[in-house]
């Protein structure tokens, strides 16, 4: 098969980016051709990745490429621009179009609650050859749009293999981890919806109980400078490491090493990092968004006291890690099966 993945391509290594790259690498390892088209403003030079500078350039590229499947990856809000792109792809002859919809919070949003057959969104979605929902709530929404069951799959957006515990961590992270116990980790984009300021403030409470505790914040985004200022203003600034973006393999190794993964959010869907941590057997403390998988310690939104209490309880419990037994690739195999079964 010849496939093109369309969506945000790393960096940064957010959840959608991670899933897109995982599918691409899996397909290439299994003898398929898979390029990628980056859809945001960042311009890079990754091999096999196209970086169109405008909608016109993107349209010309899609017309020119001779492929079997166009696989779109949408997260966040569903804009008219994205809807138009999906419609355009369905009009191209000789190609199948698949959409992975990653925005777990969209079904409960005002726009998501208006899902219906007679909407423009419904018209476009019914034209797609395949739709991948990353959770059951999204799948139910697409059924309201009229997507036929034989074209709809629920496939979790993560794939992970156990990292080698002997793999060295970057010196800066290794030094920080060696100096702090418990070692707490948060992984995600540095954006307002991830409520990272709450974690920084909660470290004051956590340090009262665990004086050597440390928090590493991994990711990139628009709040980087303001978070640096917030951290620098704290008397415990040396206990927080704003690391920056990190390659996925290193991130998984850090997840394996940490005492707990924190996922505080104001708005969130089905988090890839949460799924990865659960697969590795790493304890996870996350804001309750109504759609978290089993096995997490849930806390209310923006609740500093409950976050501190949860860290204390999880660290004090010290339960043994229980990684999952499968190879972590079933979700990628499910995507490949969907490609083969497209009508």
Language model features: what each stretch is:
Residues 4, 172-194, 200-203:
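Conserved donor-binding/catalytic core segment of Leloir-type glycosyltransferases
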Residues 228-246:
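Nucleotide-activated donor-binding/catalytic signature segment of Leloir-type glycosyltransferases, i.e.
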Residues 245-246, 253-258:
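Short alpha-helical donor nucleotide-sugar binding micro-motif in glycosyltransferases
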Residues 266:
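Aromatic "clamp/platform" in nucleotide-sugar-dependent glycosyltransferases that forms part
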Residues 316-343:
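A charged, aromatic-enriched C-terminal amphipathic alpha-helix characteristic of glycosyltransferases
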């Amino acid at each position: 098969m010849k496939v093109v993945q369309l969506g945000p391509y790393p960096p940064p290594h957010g959840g959608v980016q991670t899933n897109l790259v995982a599918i691409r690498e899996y397909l290439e390892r299994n003898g398929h051709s898979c390029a990628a088209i980056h859809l945001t403003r960042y311009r890079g030079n990754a091999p096999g990745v196209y970086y169109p500078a405008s909608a016109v350039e993107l349209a010309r590229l899609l017309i020119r490429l001779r492929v079997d499947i166009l696989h779109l990856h949408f997260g966040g809000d569903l804009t008219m621009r994205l809807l138009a792109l999906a419609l355009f792809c369905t009009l191209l002859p000789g190609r199948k179009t698949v959409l992975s919809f990653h925005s777990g919070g969209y079904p409960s949003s005002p726009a998501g609650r208006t899902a219906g057959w007679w909407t423009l969104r419904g018209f476009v979605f019914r034209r797609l050859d395949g739709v991948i929902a990353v959770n059951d709530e999204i799948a139910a929404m697409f059924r309201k749009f009229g997507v036929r069951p034989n074209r709809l799959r629920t496939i979790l957006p993560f794939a992970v293999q156990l990292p080698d515990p002997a793999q060295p961590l970057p010196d800066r992270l290794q030094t920080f981890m060696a100096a702090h116990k418990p070692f707490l980790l948060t992984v995600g984009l540095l954006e307002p919806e991830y409520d990272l300021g709450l974690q920084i403030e909660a470290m004051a409470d956590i340090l009262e109980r665990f004086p050597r505790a440390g928090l590493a914040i991994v990711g990139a985004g628009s709040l980087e400078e303001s978070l640096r200022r917030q951290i620098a203003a704290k008397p415990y600034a040396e206990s927080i490491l704003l690391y920056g973006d990190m390659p996925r393999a290193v991130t998984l190794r850090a997840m394996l090493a940490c005492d707990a993964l924190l996922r505080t959010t104001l708005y969130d869907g089905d988090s890839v990092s949460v799924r990865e941590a659960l697969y590795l057997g790493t304890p996870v403390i996350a804001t309750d968004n109504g759609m978290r998988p089993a096995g997490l310690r849930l806390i209310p939104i923006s609740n500093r006291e409950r976050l501190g209490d949860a860290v204390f309880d999880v660290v004090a419990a010290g339960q043994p890690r229980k990684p999952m037994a499968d190879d972590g690739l079933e979700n990628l195999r499910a995507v490949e099966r969907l490609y083969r079964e497209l009508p």
